[in-house]
Regions:
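Conserved core of the sugar-phosphate nucleotidyltransferase
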Residues: 118-207
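Conserved alpha/beta core of the MobA/IspD/sugar-nucleotide pyrophosphorylase nucleotidyltransferase superfamily
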Residues: 2, 8-10, 182-259
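N-terminal glycine-rich phosphate-binding loop and ensuing alpha1 helix
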Residues: 3, 14-64
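Class I S-adenosyl-L-methionine
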Residues: 53, 71-75, 221, 249
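Short, high-confidence coil segments that cap the C-terminus of an alpha-helix
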Residues: 58, 104-105, 133-136, 225
Length: 259
């Protein structure tokens, strides 16, 4: 493993240190080399890194990868790098591997490397929620989605929450009448964990709900973990295909805000 090059983005607090990790892999089956694909004049991964740096409250931010091509490009734009093993089968595995080397970290963020329009303000709110309430062991982000056609798609993950803002269920299906303006929210693939829960989560085998829905967060739901859902201002989606990337290129970027 090569030495890491962490870049601090806030004021470290050993009691509540927040570690942000952006997992990135080169060999995506639908879009090989996706993190390095150019978007608005920069590698897509750089947009994620820059938006994550704008978010407040993250004490250390690193990109986790097992590919030297990604590491080389990321170092060139100033990112901290953590080289992970080839054994990681998911982004969460990479995040957990980094977290094992950071025993001081209290909260660990999993920030997807294919979300170039990451909402910095929502990440700030998620970090604030985790810092403010030690009883929250896992958190995520969701948004109101006005595009009902999008909410009808199985490619869009929905979540319904209870009166206290905790997730009841996540699904790709038309959950709670989402396509008809029902109460379901559009889920964003950003997660915050207390470090002990993250390490435990990574050791759990996939559950039946996770396998049925193809949603990793249901592994926690099945185990009785309460997931706090922070409401963001505007939906943002990941890039899965070259066609989606081309559509973003044509449309242009949304504004960045730290909250």
């Amino acid at each position: 493993m090569l030495p890491s090059n962490p870049v601090p983005t806030g004021t470290a607090d050993n009691r509540r240190a927040v570690l942000g990790v952006i997992p990135a892999r080169y060999g995506a089956s639908r879009f090989p080399g996706k993190p390095l694909a150019m978007l608005w004049g920069k590698p897509m991964l750089q947009h994620v890194w820059e938006r994550a740096r704008v978010a407040r409250g993250i004490d250390e931010l690193v990109i986790a990868t097992d590919d030297e091509r990604i590491a080389t490009v990321a170092r060139a734009f100033g990112a901290g790098i953590e080289m992970t093993s080839l054994d990681c089968t998911s982004g969460t595995d990479r995040v957990a591997e980094v977290a094992r080397t950071r025993p001081h970290a209290q909260v660990v963020l999993n920030l997807q490397g294919d979300e170039p329009e990451l909402e910095s303000a929502a990440v700030t709110e998620l970090v604030s929620a985790m810092r403010a309430d030690d009883t929250i062991t896992m958190g995520t982000i969701a948004h109101h989605e006005p595009d009902l056609a999008a909410m009808a798609s199985e490619n869009v993950v929905k979540v319904v929450v209870d009166d206290e803002g905790y997730a009841l269920y996540f699904s790709r299906a038309d959950l709670a009448g989402a396509s008809r303006g029902g109460p379901a929210l559009r889920h964003a693939g950003v997660y915050a964990f207390r470090r002990p829960l993250l390490l435990e989560f990574a050791s759990w085998p996939p559950g039946k709900l996770e396998q049925a829905e193809r949603l990793e967060q249901l592994r926690a739901v099945e185990r009785g973990v309460r997931i706090k859902v922070v409401l963001g201002e505007r939906p943002f989606a990941g890039v899965d295909t070259p066609e989606q990337l081309a559509a973003l290129e044509r449309r242009g970027p949304q504004a960045v805000g730290a909250g």
